[in-house]
Design a protein with these regions (language model features):
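Pre-Walker A (pre-P-loop) alpha-helix and adjacent loop at the N terminus of AAA/AAA+ ATPase modules
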Residues: 10-56, 93, 97, 202
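Walker A/P-loop
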Residues: 41-83, 93-101, 122, 157
């Protein structure tokens, strides 16, 4: 089972329950929180709209939650949209013209904004102006509308795909990193308390260890552990319950799922450990190159199982060891 699959409605509702609603609830990312709170407090003291903010990092690290906390600290309403939802200029115009003074506009998946939409955003972000072309042909004219002071908060998993002009218009950019294990354990403990679960310290550690250092994944595993505990009539979530659940999910002790192991095995067995290019690897896996680069690789690289070199991807000695495959002495990585 892929624990990153699209969530059913019930899980989405539970996710809303587990989402931190205050800075104290938001565990981890301490440097980001410290700098962000200073920016927000200064804007409030000046009674000005906050600078536009960009959050980037892997999925599930808390970018959306930060956007909500920004709006809460500013005492502002938050309007939510996404890059794919803003296909036409009229889509963006409808969003911008419905903003009120001080609103926070959150655009998720900002890297999927098309260039024409970005160009409309430039004057909106810089000068609070919305420039619209009215009419067609020789009768066409430019209409300029004033916008109220607002704060744009954008989130992306691929900051490199944002154009330079768009990136430069954010007053502050924050990279969210993978979480430290103690922070993930604290998040699991908090979520278990909110879900009214009786869970042992050993089970908390197991869920955290399999979470890929990502709060969203940790919470999703915890919900599946809860399901198994209820169905098996377990009195509490202990090490045995957590172990059985992870086995059923095919998630190992490092948080690797079947597709992660298959990627490493393919590099080792088909390409002698690498190096192998992304396009060739995608073809061998019958998978999308974007999935490899955006979903699988970052975590595998962060835990030292995969190396990305100018010549291509290589499985490290640690990958051989984790998969129980002898590491060839002649191949040094």
């Amino acid at each position: 089972m892929d624990i990153k699959e699209k969530l059913p409605l019930e899980d989405q509702t539970i996710d809303s329950l587990l989402r931190p609603i205050s800075w104290d609830d938001y565990v981890g990312q301490e440097k980001v929180k410290t700098n962000l709170k200073i920016i927000l407090e200064a804007a409030k003291l000046r009674q000005e709209a906050c600078d536009h903010l960009l959050f980037y990092g892997q999925a599930g690290l808390g970018k959306t939650t930060l956007a909500h906390l920004v709006a809460k600290q500013l005492g502002a309403n938050i309007k939510i949209t996404s890059g794919p939802a803003l296909e036409k200029m009229s889509d963006l115009a409808a969003v911008l013209t419905n903003l009120e003074k001080g609103d926070v506009l959150f655009i998720d998946e900002a890297h999927r904004l098309n260039k024409s939409i970005e160009e409309v955003l430039y004057p909106a972000m810089e000068a609070r102006k919305l420039h619209l072309m009215v009419g067609k042909g020789p009768a066409a004219r430019m209409l300029s509308l004033d916008l109220p002071p607002f704060t744009l908060v954008a989130a992306t998993t691929r900051a490199n795909l944002l154009s330079g002009p768009l990136r430069s218009r954010f007053g502050a950019s924050f990279k969210l990193d993978y979480y430290e294990n103690p922070d993930i354990e604290e998040i699991v403990k908090r979520s278990a308390k909110l879900l009214k679960l009786k869970i042992s310290p050993e089970a908390i550690r197991m869920v955290a260890a399999a979470s890929r250092f990502t709060p969203r994944v940790a919470n999703r595993i915890l919900k599946r552990v809860r399901d198994y505990a209820e169905v098996s009539a377990a009195k509490q979530i202990d090490e045995a319950v957590a172990t059985k659940t992870l086995e059923m999910l095919e998630v190992d002790k490092l948080g690797l799922e079947p597709h992660d192991r298959r990627l490493l095995e393919t590099i080792i067995k088909k390409f002698k450990g690498g190096p192998v290019g992304a396009a060739t690897l995608a073809a061998a896996l019958n998978d999308d190159r974007g999935n490899i680069e955006d979903i699988y690789e970052p975590y595998l690289m962060s835990i030292g199982l995969l190396a990305r070199t100018p010549a291509g991807r290589m499985a490290t000695e640690a990958a051989y060891e984790h998969l129980g495959i002898p590491f060839p002495d002649k191949k040094l990585i």
